[in-house]
């Protein structure tokens, strides 16, 4: 464990980079020394604003060198850094910003009372050693879940956990990460640095000696070609679309060496097809916001395995009674990682459900083979993964049932070429009422956001029942939309 707290390892990477380019943004190139300078000035600005250990700072930022530096500066002053994803529905954004937030930092038009990056950068750097104020047991960052339960849950990771992560420490990289790091010469960054995946691969790129390349328009394959990217994160739907585009009109992807598939499982045959069309570049990671990376399959691994968990990560497969099961037997995955969250911020009930005895209950189902490879086979949760975001069926059902036209609502998921999975709803009308599908979709969108809006809404007389007489959603078949 380093003598100085996080982000000492990241600052050391920037200092070692010196005049080497570490971020490209349009025509602008930022070196390690320049980015370190931005961190120092932004940390000074935050301290001048009275912010320090234990303070919550909401980062409402784009993807720029200053945004990356602001996140690191927040850690330098020992704050609780809260990345706010763009596009959050109003109610969810208000929920995040009311969770013990002392200040908002933005690079856009500031709301009343918000601090701007430009204002913070006006604070001069005193030239002395950059003081790091993080305390081991303080929460260093909150990474919010998708909000599919109605309000996003903030996974709380301490400074001690950030220090324990391997990302910025090459000597601690497991074999799959070493192989991936060797391909990160030009890592394409887009979307939001509030994304745990996007930010962590950015730090890994620094440690690997590569350059983060910002794509303001992340359409694939165009962005890969334009920026000569060697690596990028990709969701399952985007992977499928890229494979289809390459079959129809191949683009020059000769620079590409790694695509890190994130967010949801890839069907084995589709993964083989992707590797046939794109070459040996597809890495399939498995992890959760609560745990970080659990395992990663490299291009040489055989689908549908998600690879070997590193030695520093404990994975147990347990039966419904919590008893570990032997290799080859399916069960629920319980995971323990050095950098895992300690719980959900201000949510003791959900924390007790998921975090128990030092383990994280993933609520994913899988098994090991005799050689120790990990396989995923399903979920214990009633969730649908749309565009790599988990959306719980329950809140969608409750939103639909809030309509006076609806007596009962049931939601299921089904594979979808465009979004990985899609939400499909079945509704029983209230007596004498005729549901309006457009109004129901608007109701869900306003309450839970676009990702929860059903792709189809089917009116039924009653829900099918299982042998027990209870409603059985497994008997509901979504409409075939392949035609």
Task: Name each model feature, range by range.
Residues 19, 127-144, 151, 177-186:
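Conserved pre-ATP/AMP-binding loop-to-beta segment of ANL
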Residues 308-312, 323-354, 389-391:
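Conserved ATP/PPi-binding loop(s) of AMP-dependent carboxylate-activating enzymes
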Residues 31-33, 140-167:
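Conserved AMP-binding A3 loop
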Residues 104, 337, 342-343, 365-452, ...:
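AMP-binding/adenylate-forming catalytic core of the ANL superfamily
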Residues 166-186, 192-231, 245:
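Conserved AMP-binding/adenylation subdomain of ANL enzymes
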């Amino acid at each position: 464990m380093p003598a100085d707290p996080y982000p000492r390892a990241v600052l050391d990477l920037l200092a070692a980079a010196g005049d080497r380019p570490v971020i490209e943004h349009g025509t602008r190139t930022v070196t390690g020394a320049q980015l370190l300078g931005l961190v120092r000035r932004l940390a000074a600005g935050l301290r001048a604003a009275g912010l320090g250990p234990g303070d919550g700072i909401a980062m409402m930022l784009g993807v720029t060198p200053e945004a990356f530096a602001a996140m690191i500066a927040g850690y330098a002053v020992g704050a609780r850094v809260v990345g706010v994803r763009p596009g959050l529905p109003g109610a969810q954004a208000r929920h995040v910003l009311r969770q013990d937030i002392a200040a908002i930092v933005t690079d856009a038009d500031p709301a009343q009372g918000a601090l701007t990056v430009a204002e913070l950068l006006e604070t001069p750097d005193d030239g002395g050693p950059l003081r790091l104020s993080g305390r081991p047991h303080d929460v260093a960052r909150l990474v919010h879940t998708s909000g599919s339960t109605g309000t996003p849950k903030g996974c709380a990771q301490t400074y001690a956990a950030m220090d324990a992560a391997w990302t910025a420490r090459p000597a601690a990289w497991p074999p799959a990460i070493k192989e991936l790091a060797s391909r990160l010469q030009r890592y394409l960054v887009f979307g939001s640095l509030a994304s745990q995946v996007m930010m962590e691969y950015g730090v890994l790129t620094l440690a690997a000696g590569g350059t983060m390349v910002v794509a303001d328009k992340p359409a694939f394959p165009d962005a890969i070609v334009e920026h000569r990217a060697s690596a990028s994160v990709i969701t399952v739907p985007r992977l499928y679309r890229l494979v289809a585009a390459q079959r129809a009109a191949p683009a020059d992807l000769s620079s590409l060496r790694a695509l890190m598939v994130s967010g949801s499982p890839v069907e084995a045959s589709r993964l083989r097809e992707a590797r046939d069309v794109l070459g040996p570049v597809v890495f399939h990671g498995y992890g959760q916001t609560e745990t970080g990376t659990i395992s990663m399959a490299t291009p040489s691994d055989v689908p549908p395995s998600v690879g070997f968990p590193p030695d520093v990560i404990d994975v147990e497969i347990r039966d419904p009674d919590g008893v570990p099961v032997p290799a080859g037997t399916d069960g629920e995955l319980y995971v323990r990682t050095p950098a895992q969250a300690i719980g959900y911020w201000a949510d003791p009930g959900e924390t007790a459900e998921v975090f128990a005895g030092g383990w994280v209950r993933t609520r994913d189902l899988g098994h090991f083979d005799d050689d120790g490879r990990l396989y995923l086979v399903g979920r214990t949760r009633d969730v649908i993964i749309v565009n790599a975001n988990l959306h719980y069926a329950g809140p969608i059902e409750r939103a639909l049932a809030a309509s006076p036209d609806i007596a009962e609502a049931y939601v299921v998921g089904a594979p979808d070429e465009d979004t990985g999975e899609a939400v499909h709803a079945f509704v029983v009308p209230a007596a004498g009422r005729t549901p309006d599908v457009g109004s129901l979709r608007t109701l869900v969108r306003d309450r839970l956001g676009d990702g929860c809006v059903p792709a189809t809404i089917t009116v039924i007389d009653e829900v099918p029942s299982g042998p027990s007489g209870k409603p059985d959603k497994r008997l509901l078949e979504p409409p075939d939309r392949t035609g």
